[in-house]
Amino acid sequence: MGSFQKGIFLALCGLRLIQGTVVLSVAEPENNQIKDRALYTYPYTCPSILVGTGDTCDDLASRCSISAASFTSFNPTTGCSSLPRGKPVCCGPGETRFPPDSGGYCYAYTIRDGDTCAKIAEGYKITTADIETWNTNTSAWYGCNKLQQGGQVCLSKGEPSMPVAIGGAVCGPQVPGTARPILWTSIASLNPCPAGQCCSTKGQCGTGKDFCDSSAPAAAAPPAPATKAKSAVSEAKAATANEVTSVKTTSAPAAIAPPVPATKAISTSSTTKATSAASETKGAPLSARSFVTMTAAAVTVTVKAASTTKNADPHAFTTDIPLVDVPLTFLHPEDTKSAPAAAQTKAATGDVADFLKPAKEISILASQLRNNLVSTTTSVTKATGAAKSKAPSENSQTKKSPTQTVNGVVTVPSGWSLKMFDGIGCTGSYVLLQGHNKKLEDSTCMKFRSASTLQTDVTDTAVSCRWWTIPESGNWEWRDCHSNSLNRPKSWIMSNGLCTVSPNTKCDLVSDISQTYGWRGPGLCQDRKTVDPTFGSLKCYVG
């Protein structure tokens, strides 16, 4: 080979080397951009974006910072001629469907008011057939035609999660604190009822069609709040020997009386006519909506009021009852449930051991204590002033304060609350959101940082937000949520309601991927998982 041919050969090799270097220099930034862009916050297996109004495949490829050919290879089934708004598309290898998590469990979705399988499938870009297939083993799954509000369904392959706990449930897998069985086929046998009774879909034992009917209930919405109930003692006068006293409720609001001291309650029960009737009803099954009423003798909770300073310790008492928190998924917290007279007679005889056996009764007691905490803890009144104050007349009614101040923290006992922590395991600084609205449509779109309109004052007419931190001084302090907040909390506690979170800032719960969080039972703390979205905006309600 002559020198001229060698020169040509070396020149060609140099050009190939330069071309390869250019290709590498172009390809590497493309991959880095895909990994580094903050846009990819949606819980998919591939880095993805959502199709916007009027987007073309070229527009989407440009937003992904990749070539049109790469976009086509990552989305082989996407038709560029018809791109529906809100459809997720991949900017890298993978697929947009949710995979099972690291434990093999499915991606769980909490049913909200107004949900249908068609709406859920459209929002998560799956099919109704997928939902039916993935939920064949889900507890309390009755098909797409009978979705149960507050229940959970699988939106991916994997083992179903435990059903959401129901406050006051006494049987079945939805009793608060029930652990997952080793064999999923054993879930129906958890917390069985006594012999001869069946467990209803609401977790109550009894007999008859409402308890022993294996068919699914009608699509259920949460019951309407009932804040006025007749006393079981007075109702027992008309009860027969083999009947359980019924509970009559009205929708008219009424003040809830504070709990009666234990000694007084026992003496009153023993002198009423209900005692003899109650003893005859012993052993009768409870109705589906009954709760065992326990007197204040079972547990004593001492609440001390303190000054309302910003440095007060917020952990001493908040919206959660000490020891156990009992927000309800299906039952409103202000519902007053009268017990069968048999339960009161049992309390009067002093059988305290029965109160300590099942955890469900402790939960019920905590719920009633929360509803009956008196508003007098909002301020410290001198003993001399209390002695001079007039006793209220028998016909007068005292309106219960919607807010309480305990150890410097103002709370709304009958409302919902959400604590979002910056540490795993619900530790560290946190944002405390509190409200009172009962329905999702009554909630305003809540946002943080400069767009926030949330106030720090806790009232019964608006949502409040406080950002609690511990500065170098070592004392807890709070400030507003306008400048500092958490849009990706590492853990959170949802009490007495549900919050629907959306990664956008417009509370767009249809076109974007949203998730609903509710009370999960004792322990309460929920740590962030890879499938949890950014907390861009949210709506919360008692539910």
Curated annotation (Swiss-Prot):
Classify the source by domain of life: Eukaryota
Q: Where is the composition biased (Polar residues)?
A: 392-406
**Xref: Gene3D superfamilies:** Endochitinase-like, LysM domain
When this gene is knocked out, what is seen? Answer: Shows no significant difference in the expansion rate of lesion diameters in apples fruits.
Short name of one Pfam family for this protein?
Chitin_bind_1
Q: What does the record give under GO molecular function?
A: chitin binding
PROSITE patterns given in the database record: CHIT_BIND_I_1, LYSM
Q: Which cysteines are joined by disulfide bonds?
A: none
User: What GO cellular component entries does it have?
Assistant: extracellular region
Q: Where is this region: Disordered?
A: 383-406
Q: Where does the protein end up?
A: Secreted
Question: Which key words are in the record?
Answer: Chitin-binding, Glycoprotein, Repeat, Secreted, Signal, Virulence
Residues spanning the signal sequence: 1-20
LysM domain: residues covered: 47-91, 107-155
Record keyword DNA damage present: no
Q: Which residues are glycosylated?
A: N137
Which segments of the protein form a coiled coil according to its record? Answer: none
User: Which family does this protein fall into?
Assistant: Belongs to the secreted LysM effector family.
Q: What is known of its domains?
A: The LysM (lysin motif) domains are small globular domains involved in binding chitin in eukaryotes. LysM6 contains 2 LysM domains.
Its function, per the record, reads:
Secreted LysM effector that might have a role in sequestration of chitin oligosaccharides (breakdown products of fungal cell walls that are released during invasion and act as triggers of host immunity) to dampen host defense.
The further comment given in this record reads:
In plants, chitin acts as a microbe-associated molecular pattern (MAMP) that is recognized by lysin motif (LysM)-containing plant cell surface-localized pattern recognition receptors (PRRs) that activate a plethora of downstream immune responses.
The name of this protein is Secreted LysM effector LysM6
Q: What is the lineage of its organism?
A: Eukaryota, Fungi, Dikarya, Ascomycota, Pezizomycotina
